[in-house]
Swiss-Prot record:
Gene transcribed to yield this protein: nra-4
Domain of life: Eukaryota
Name of the featured protein: Nicotinic receptor-associated protein 4
Tissue: Expressed in body wall, pharyngeal, uterine and vulval muscles, motor neurons, nerve ring, motor and ventral cord neurons, hypodermal cells in the tail, vulval epithelium and intestine.
InterPro entries: NOMO-like_N, NOMO1-like_9th, NOMO_7th, SDr/BOS_complex
GO BP terms in the entry: protein-containing complex assembly
Function comment: Involved in the recognition and selection of protein complexes to exit the endoplasmic reticulum (ER). In muscles, regulates levamisole-sensitive nicotinic acetylcholine receptor (L-AChR) subunit composition, possibly by allowing only specific L-AChR subunit combinations to exit the ER. Specifically, may promote the inclusion of alpha subunit unc-38 into and the exclusion of unc-29 from L-AChR. Regulates L-AChR sensitivity to agonists such as nicotine and levamisole at neuro-muscular junctions.
Protein source organism: Caenorhabditis elegans
UniProt topological domain (Cytoplasmic) ranges: 1093-1123
């Protein structure tokens, strides 16, 4: 049996000392919660869920502290009455004695984040969704259970409970308000079902969903539904007059559906519609009767036809009064905007649309109907007729006419009919018409004809001609001007240049418009007049009269323009410009005028002289824009406020006039557009809100760009009582922690802070070593306390012997030390001294495994400057089990976890780790409980070694149990290395030397490998992670290959190292080449068996003996009992 440990060998790890670790923290809440009434507990659980320890939180501040005696994985959870919720729900801890929160004395914090909101919906089945909302935002959701019961969780606040999305039923009033403060809430009274869901479906005849159908519900009375507005109605087609309330309930979604919740029981009429401007869809059946009663209802609509409209245009201009043909039948006439409504359009049907008008040809379009889309292109004019009459000459000849398009200069020659009439269809546009024969006496000689909105049918070319005269009446000499003559429709006949008299020769009869253009030099009573030419011997004459002189001015930005005659100031006037435009100013006489610009912009010249008349355009350009702001000075005449303007060009300062109640202005160059300015007000007496503001320069004037409020600052006279000198007092602005005001108290404890706006805006603190300062109800005033001392000793109540290893927790309660907290493990003296304590109430708790202290928490009152002495006594209430684990050889086994588990005592569990000498002590075992004690695992989590016996059954009494000794069988962990040498690549090599070292220098082995053998083995090496260097070199000169070295780490059961050989003369180390045992499945296994024949036979025999002992009935499960 001496070979048994070779089969069951396990990993040995260093042992851990039995230290005690403090897992401390607090249960915090933003709402005032009475922990003493709740009796909150924090539980320490193993990963299997076994409870290791349970501790009540401090009733004053929620603090807790739990001792942990063994390293390992644990879970902390808060145990509380139903309806209280904490985050996190649990905290996972791996105690390693170094890096975990408990070992580092870091706080473990649970936050009481919410409470239950529960209630009942009478008459509701299970599955009704409910939501909890705050200001419209969803906080929680749930579904009712059997009986209509529900429960949600929420932090303190004011909420509303209502049905959630997908609910087919609604509760009474739709929602109810609840307020969560510091405890679970029961919603009363119970909800009742008040309505049901209405489902609407819309589709096309081709079974596709119809989107955005508008649904209107007609009822006999107004219904109270969220987000639905009901108004009185005079009824609708096919809706009974009794249903005179109209409610818009929404639109269908992309699936063609609309769900309306909470519709009360009753009889309704539902109508569907879809209107997109002039386009609409007709549904069937529409409307339809809907009865809501005891369950969700539904209505279905089918989109059957559409109504659209067509527009008739010519060159994008609307044509009114035009008859429209739909499928060759009259559909009506267009309105003033060229539109006509077309009804009963079917989806996917072929519908043609065109128009009809005299002397006009139109395009034909097709209606494209694909619900809900209805598209009809404009019907456009293709041809207009130009018609007229040509008078015969004296010898009876009818002259031809030439039509020329103005846009592309294409021309067409027209021959009138025998009666002189002509009618030519042309595409819309502008044309010139003139006699083809340049020597012909036909007039007019040239006509400009516009055919954009209608045909032209009244043109007349005649051989009659006469002259027309235009006279100018000027102030002084008339300037050179141009008079143009137009026919109706803006057809230019002729333009004539001159000064005071303009003659238009050889023009035909008709009504003309004469327009005067003098290049803007003069002002005229009329610049356009009507000229009528009749077929008579009298030459028509008209007169244009000048009433002033004009000057052209262009100002770059908006401004008011004022002018006055330099010699006669009574001749003055004003006008305005929006900037960037050329305007004319009219003055009564010529001469020199003074012009000034009034604007928020600064110009290159704000005033200038202008000589009238003036050829050309006078221009002025703005160079800066005004920015203004205000500071509310509260009518303070002595404010002495200045403004600092910070920019990339530097800082500049301006004074704020107090008489204008804080209004200030400054000018910023237009070139600074896009720059950010920072405006900072300052004063020795006043404070400002905000302290600064930014303005972006836009290149435009900015009125009231910034506004500051100001107020006189106040100074706080603070105090410390009893007086403490040289205390440091800091006032930190709550909104900006960088704003700090400091002061030092004098010998009377007085100090001054300021100027400030409101003391309440600052957090004020006082500090000095050896003192504690508590703010009073009056800001800036403190109560000072000289700190005190407390000594605590912990002893056994029977023997009065000091109890070392006690975890002592001291927590502040009421008074100046309410935020104090300290945890300490007592040494062999069992004594702890606390210094510099603030006077007040403290809670002290002593914790030692197997001991109970009564009361569990003691209250100690520490008085100012006093030294308090306290003795705590503990009574032993649980006991230990002692034992040892050793190998069959007698060697101690360390770092094995021994566990004691009691199924009969609520799965109470405790464990310990074996020490260097293999001993262990399992603490905290309860009397009258029966435990199973067994090896659980190694401390690193690897499986425990096999032991004899497998377990002990221990019935605990009020005494320790000793002598629980385990004998373990272990298997040593080793590594075998197979070295494969690439000798086949160099057949001339007959033998090589293998040199093996570790840790770079330590010699391990030197061996020769002779061909044809090319494998070498190292067996039973310790699996300890050591790196081995394997060097293969030529055994005899001459050297046919360069020596090779590979490195292997002993960290697995089997490692294979390959060493390739080449004829290269260069020395070279190669990288690790490591495979697994499977890479050489046959020859490596065979070689191992060959080289270890005795060991294999011994292992096989040991395994057979072990199997017989294990499966034969034996008494290896010993029972130990102490009474």
């Amino acid at each position: 049996m001496g070979s048994l440990p070779l089969i069951l060998l396990s990993l040995l790890l260093p042992g851990a000392l039995a230290n005690v670790y403090s897992c401390a923290g607090s249960v915090k809440s933003t709402s005032p919660v009475d922990y003493s009434q709740l009796k909150l507990q924090v539980r320490l659980l193993t990963l299997e869920g076994h409870m290791k320890h349970e501790e009540e939180v401090n009733p004053s501040n929620g603090y807790f502290m739990i001792p942990v005696y063994n390293k390992g994985h644990y879970t902390l959870k808060v145990s509380a009455p139903a309806g209280y919720y904490f985050e996190p729900d649990s905290i996972e801890i791996k105690i390693d004695g170094k890096t975990d929160a408990c070992s580092l004395n870091e706080d473990l914090v649970f936050h009481l984040t919410g409470f239950s909101v529960r209630g009942t919906v009478d008459g509701a089945a299970a599955g009704l969704p409910l939501v909890l909302t705050e200001n419209g935002k969803q906080i929680a959701e749930t579904k009712t259970e059997d009986g209509g019961k529900y429960e949600m969780r929420a932090p303190p606040g004011k909420y509303e409970v209502s049905t959630g999305a997908g609910a087919s039923e609604c509760i009474s009033k739709g929602k109810t308000s609840v307020e969560v403060k510091n405890a679970p809430v029961v919603v009363t009274p119970n909800f009742k079902i008040s309505g049901y869901q209405l489902e609407v479906h819309t589709r096309t005849e081709s079974m596709n969903p119809f989107v955005d159908a508008v649904m209107t519900l007609y009822a006999t009375s107004s219904i109270d539904l969220p987000n639905i507005k009901c108004v009185g109605s005079e009824g609708s087609l096919n809706v009974p007059s009794t249903h005179n309330v109209k409610c818009s309930i929404g639109k269908t979604d992309p699936r063609g559906r609309l769900s309306v919740a909470c519709v009360p029981s009753g009889e309704y009429y539902l109508a569907a519609s879809h209107v997109n401007g002039p386009k609409s869809i007709n549904f069937s059946p529409n409307p339809q009767k809907v009865v809501v009663s005891q369950a969700a209802s539904e209505a279905r609509f089918v989109a059957q036809s559409a109504t659209g409209r067509v527009r008739v245009t010519s060159k994008d201009l609307p044509l009114s009064g035009v008859e429209v043909l739909v499928n060759e039948k009259s559909g009506g006439k267009t309105d003033s905007q060229g539109y006509l409504k077309i009804e009963n359009l079917k989806e996917d049907e072929h519908t043609t649309i065109t128009a009809k008008a005299p002397n006009t040809q139109f395009s034909t379009v097709h209606a494209n109907v694909k619900f809900p889309k209805v598209e009809i292109q404009d019907v456009t004019v293709q041809k207009f007729d130009i018609c007229g009459q040509v008078e015969k000459s004296e010898n009876g000849v009818l002259g031809k006419l030439t039509f020329t398009r103005k846009d592309d200069k294409r021309s067409l020659e027209i021959q009138p009919k025998a009666d002189g009439s002509f009618c030519q269809p042309v595409s819309p546009g502008l044309f010139t018409i003139e006699p083809t024969d340049k020597t012909s006496s036909l007039t007019p000689r040239l006509l400009e004809v516009e055919v954009l909105k209608n045909a032209v049918t009244n043109l007349r070319f005649t051989h009659f001609k006469t002259n027309a005269n235009v006279h100018l009446s000027c102030i002084g000499a008339c300037p050179t001007a141009t008079v143009s003559l137009f026919l109706p429709g803006q057809t230019l006949v002729r333009s004539v240049k001159g000064t005071d008299v303009f003659t238009f020769e050889n023009i035909g009869p008709g009504t003309y418009s004469a327009r005067l253009d003098d290049n803007g030099r003069g002002c005229w009573e009329k610049s356009e007049m009507t000229l009528v030419v009749e077929q008579s011997n009298t030459q028509p004459t008209i007169h244009f009269k000048q009433n002033g002189f004009a000057a052209q001015i262009e100002i770059s930005h908006p401004a008011e323009i004022e002018w006055s005659n330099a010699d006669k100031k009574q001749l003055n006037g004003k006008t305005s410009t929006k900037g960037g435009e050329v305007i004319s100013i009219c003055v009564p006489t010529s001469g020199v005028y003074d012009v000034s610009l009034g604007s928020c912009y600064k110009f290159e010249r704000q005033q200038f002289k202008l000589t009238v008349p003036f050829d050309g355009v006078h221009k002025e350009k703005a160079v800066a824009a005004r920015i203004s702001g205000t500071i509310d000075l509260e009518n303070d005449k002595n404010a002495a406020v200045s403004i600092r303007i910070k920019s990339s060009a530097g800082d500049r300062e301006i004074q704020v006039p107090a008489l204008d109640n804080g209004r200030f202005t400054f000018e910023e160059p237009l070139a600074s557009s896009g720059e950010q300015l920072v405006i900072v007000p300052s004063s020795k007496l006043r404070l400002f809100e905000p302290t600064s503001k930014s303005v972006t320069v836009t290149g435009k004037c900015i009125e009231n760009a910034v506004k500051f409020n100001s107020f006189r600052g106040i100074f706080l006279d603070g105090s410390i009582k009893p007086a403490v000198e040289k205390a440091v007092v800091k006032a930190v602005l709550k909104k900006d922690k960088d704003v700090v005001i400091e002061a030092i108290s004098n010998k009377d404890g007085a100090f001054k802070i300021g100027p400030v706006k409101r003391v309440e805006d600052y957090d004020i603190t006082a500090t000095l070593d050896g003192f504690k300062f508590t703010p009073t109800s009056t800001p800036g005033h403190f109560q000072s306390v000289k700190l005190s001392q407390l000594s605590i000793k912990v002893v056994d109540e029977v023997t009065n012997a000091p109890l070392d290893g006690v975890l002592l927790s001291l927590v502040g309660g009421k008074g100046a030390g309410s935020d104090y907290r300290s945890n300490n493990v007592l040494d062999e003296t069992a004594h702890k001294n606390y210094v510099a304590l603030a006077p007040g109430e403290y809670f002290v708790r002593a914790i030692l495994q197997e001991y109970k202290f009564s009361p569990s928490t003691s209250t100690i009152v520490v008085k100012e400057g006093q030294h308090e002495n306290v003795v705590l006594k503990g009574k032993r209430v649980s006991f230990s089990a002692y034992g040892k684990m050793r190998e069959m050889s007698g060697d101690a086994m360390k770092d094995v976890i021994i566990e004691a588990l009691s199924e009969g005592c609520d799965l109470h569990q405790s464990e310990a780790t074996t020490k260097e000498d293999g001993t262990y002590r399992i603490r905290g075992l309860l009397p009258d409980c029966e435990y199973q004690v067994h090896a659980k695992s190694y401390a690193d989590g690897s499986p425990a070694p096999h032991s004899f016996p497998r377990s002990f059954t221990v019935s605990m009494t009020a005494e320790d149990v000793k002598g629980l000794e385990f004998m373990a069988t272990i298997t040593a962990k080793t590594t075998d290395i197979a070295v494969e040498i690439g000798m086949d690549t160099l057949p001339e090599i007959q033998s090589v030397r293998v040199v093996i070292t570790k840790n770079n220098n330590d010699h391990v082995q030197v061996a020769s490998v002779v061909a044809p053998q090319h494998l070498h083995y190292l067996v039973n090496l310790p699996r300890d992670g050591v790196e081995y260097a394997i060097r293969v070199e030529a055994e005899k000169p001459p050297q046919a290959f360069a020596a090779k070295t590979v490195r292997v780490v002993a960290d697995q059961a089997m490692k294979v190292a390959r060493v390739p050989l080449t004829s290269s003369k260069r020395a070279n180390d190669v990288d690790i080449s490591v495979g697994t045992f499977l890479s050489l499945p046959f020859f490596v296994t065979l070689a191992l068996v060959f080289f270890n024949q005795n060991r294999v036979l011994e292992l096989l025999g040991t395994f057979i003996d072990w199997a017989r002992n294990t499966f034969a009935p034996t008494a290896d499960n010993h029972h130990r009992k102490r009474k």
